[in-house]
Amino acid sequence: MTRLSILLLLISLVYSTPYPQTQISKKIGDDATLSCSRNNINDYVVMSAWYKEPNSIILLAAKSDVLYFDNYTKDKISYDSPYDDLVTTITIKSLTAKDAGTYVCAFFMTSTTNDTDKVDYEEYSTELIVNTDSESTIDIILSGSSHSPETSSEKPDYINNFNCSLVFEIATPGPITDNVENHTDTVTYTSDIINTVSTSSRESTTVKTSGPITNKEDHTVTDTVSYTTVSTSSEIVTTKSTANDAHNDNEPSTVSPTTVKNITKSIGKYSTKDYVKVFGIAALIILSAVAIFCITYYICNKRSRKYKTENKV
């Protein structure tokens, strides 16, 4: 009856999916030793077994008797059970790519105190990885749970807009016209880069304008005007750089100014310290008024009693 229970339990274990606890990495041609130890050392081990997922039984062992299944032999897989059946070990020789997979060992135990047919078991799994390259052998002991690296995102210190609001009005310059004797070159500028950096102490705005060139002659004219505006809390600095055309014509040009308006509004918030100061000043004023009232009352009362005493005499 006990053997039948063990057989049925083994069949159910073969088709179950235990979670791997140990991972071993080896190269092709090496030998891999897989071992597991049981936690329950009080019960009697009736039989131990090794099988390979998904449904391949390798061997059944009872003491020194080993029975192999599914074309496995002792020449390929050797079995050992040292330390009085506390540990069971198999050694897979001359590894090939087909030997990779998850191997599971199971202990079938019965209680030594109760005369029952109840069978208890423990199972442990090992994942064997067979590397096809010439890398060194690595044995990795895993805890059974996946671990992903921690990531953290930090917000830059200069982005802090909780106490201010910033409004920009940018007027792009109008067309630039170069008047020459025999030709007219019209250059249109459009704003293409607006970069704003806001800090707790200052705000800066960079405006760079460039655009296409409309040429009515057969020669190439290159004319680039860029504006860089830096706005701080106290001043605005505007820099203009102009590159002349390919013929080095230094004709005067008219450029509409770039208007940048920077409006900063700070909304102050009262802290607890400010409220404490206000409350302290108010309390001091009230106490001073009470003290003055008490002194005045005492003086007036003293004079009144003195006056009544003199009248009685």
UniProtKB/Swiss-Prot annotation:
Belongs to the orthopoxvirus OPG185 family. Induction: Expressed in the early phase of the viral replicative cycle. Residues 18-121 form the Ig-like V-type domain. This is Protein OPG185. It comes from the Viruses. It is a single-pass type I membrane protein. Residues 1-16 form the signal peptide. PROSITE patterns: IG_LIKE. It comes from Variola virus (isolate Human/India/Ind3/1967) (VARV). Heterodimerizes with OPG040. The heterodimer OPG185-OPG040 interacts with components of the entry fusion complex OPG143 and OPG094. Heterodimer with C3/VPC protein; disulfide-linked. The keyword Signal applies. Residues 17-277 are virion surface. The keyword Transmembrane helix applies. Keywords: Disulfide bond, Early protein, Glycoprotein, Hemagglutinin, Host membrane, Immunoglobulin domain, Late protein, Membrane, Signal, Transmembrane, Transmembrane helix, Viral envelope protein, Virion. Disulfide bonds join C36-C105. Pfam families: V-set. Prevents cell to cell fusion by interacting with and directing the viral OPG040 protein on the host plasma membrane. The OPG185-OPG040 complex associates with components of the entry fusion complex (EFC) presumably to avoid superinfection and syncytium formation. Via its interaction with C3/VCP protein, protects the infected cell and probably also the extracellular enveloped virus from complement attack. InterPro entries: Ig-like_dom (IPR007110), Ig-like_dom_sf (IPR036179), Ig-like_fold (IPR013783), Ig_sub (IPR003599), Ig_V-set (IPR013106). Its main location: virion. GO terms for cellular component: host cell membrane; membrane; viral envelope; virion membrane. Glycans are attached at N71, N114, N163, N182, N262. Residues 302-313 are intravirion. It is found in: Virion membrane; Host membrane.
